[in-house]
Amino acid sequence: MFISILLLALAVERILCANILCVFPTPAYSHQSVFSAYIDKLSWAGHNVTVITPMPRAVDHVHQVVSSLSVHYFNNLIKNSTMIKKRGVVADETTVTKENYMGLINLVAHEIKSPNVTRLLRNKGNKFDLIVCEAYVSYILVFGAIYDAPVIQFSSGYAIPENFETVGGEVARNHIKHPNIWRSDFSKSNFEQLMTENYLKNEWALLEKEQENMLKRDFGYHHDMCQLKSRVLMLFINVPAVFDNNRDVSNNIQYLGGIHLKKPRTVRDSRLLSFMEKHHIIVYASFGSGIDVLNMDANLIAEFVRVFNSIPYAVLWKVDSSIHLKHNISSNVHTQSWFPQRDVLNHPHIKVFITQGGVQSTDEAVNSGVPMIGIPIMGDQFYNVRRYTELGIGEKVNILRLEEEGLDRKIKNLVHNKSYELNIKRLNLFISDTPVKPLRKALWFTNYVLRNKDAIDKFK
C-alpha cells in the first residue's frame, strides 16, 4: 500500500514539475506580453520553465535563454520593409509573399543560431517533457525532434490555416466564414476571394518548403515538415472563439483570449490624469507598439492632425513628440510617445478608441467597454477590424483612403450612438462568462498534454 501511494505521489510530482521549453522568438511586445503571462503561470504552478526569447525580463522564476541581437535585427527588418508598404506603413494581402516573409524566418533562424541558444542545444544533459512553440513559424518545430518531446503550438493572436491543418482541423479553410487571416479585402466577388485564398495558400507553402530546406542546412534534419508537425498535439489560440466566428474545432484546439489582461490601475501620471479629468469625452488614438506614426506618408499624418484638431473632444494620441516640429497641434490634443493603455482605456472619460486593430488592444478595449474605430495596417488586423463591424462594437476605416473615409464623422457617431457601447459591454459579459479563466485554461490543457501525450498521439 505504501509503495502504491509513493508511486502515485511521484507520478503527480512528475506531472506538476515538468521540464518545459518555450520557444517564443518574435521580438514584439504584443506577442511577448501574452507569452510572458503564460510562462509565469506555468512557473507558479510548479513547472521548470526554460524560454528562448529575444526580450528578456527582470525575473528569476524562469530560465531565460536570450537570443542575442534579434531586437536590433527586427528593427532593421521593419525599417527596410517600407519599400513594400503602402502609404509608408500598410502591408495588406498583396504583400504576403514568400520573399517578403523570408526576412522574418531568417530573423528566427538568426536567433536559434545565437550563442546562448547554441549553448543550450550543445548541453546534452538538457531534457524536456514538452515544447511550446510560437505557432506561425514552422522552423522552430525542430525542437520537438531534438528533444523527442510533444509540442504545443501557441498563437498570440489568430491562428493561420496551416495551424489548423497541423492538428487535424476540418474547418481550416472556408473563404466565407473563416477567411485566411492574412486577407485584407473582403469586398471582392466570390471568385476573387477564392483566388486570393489560393494565392495565400501557395505563398505559405513556398515559405514552409524554404523552412524545410533551412532545417537541412542548419541542423542536418532531412525529414519533411509533416514529420515535425506530427508531434504537435495541441493548438492554443489567444482570441475569444466568437472573434473567430465560433469555428467548429476539436478538443486539441483551445481558444483563450485576453490572457495578458491584468487588473487596471488608476492613471499615475499626474499631468496625464489632470488632462483626462478636465475633459469628459476623450478619444484615445494608438496604433500599437509596432507602428511609428511618423513613418506614415505626409498626407496621412496631416489628415490625422486635421481631424484631431477639429473634433469637439479631447484626444490622447500616441505619437512621438517630434510631430510638433512640423504640425500645429491643438490644445485639445495631448501627445505622448507611450501611454499606460490598459489604465487609460479603463478611465470613464474614454469614449472612443482609434486602433490599428491588434488583438491585445482589442482585448483591452472589450474588457473596458470602449467602442473602437479600427484602422488596420497589417497582418490579422484587417480581419479583426472586420469583426468590429459584424459584432456592432465599432467601425472600420480604410487607411489607404483616409481622406475620403470621414474619420471625424465616424468618431462623432461612436460618441453619440450608444448602441456601440451597449454591444461591447454585452460582448465583454458574454466572453467573461466562462467556468474557467483563459490563463487557467491554458495551464490545465498544458497539464492535460503532459498527462495524456501518448493517448493524444494515438487517438488524435
UniProtKB/Swiss-Prot annotation:
Keywords: Glycosyltransferase, Signal, Transferase. The keyword ATP-binding does not apply. SUPFAM superfamilies: UDP-Glycosyltransferase/glycogen phosphorylase. Residues 1-18 form the signal peptide. Its EC number is 2.4.1.-. The keyword Signal applies. Pfam families: UDPGT (PF00201). It comes from the Viruses. GO terms for molecular function: UDP-glycosyltransferase activity. Belongs to the UDP-glycosyltransferase family. Catalyzes the transfer of glucose from UDP-glucose to ecdysteroids which are insect molting hormones. Expression of egt interferes with normal insect development and block molting. This is Ecdysteroid UDP-glucosyltransferase. It comes from Lacanobia oleracea granulosis virus (LoGV).
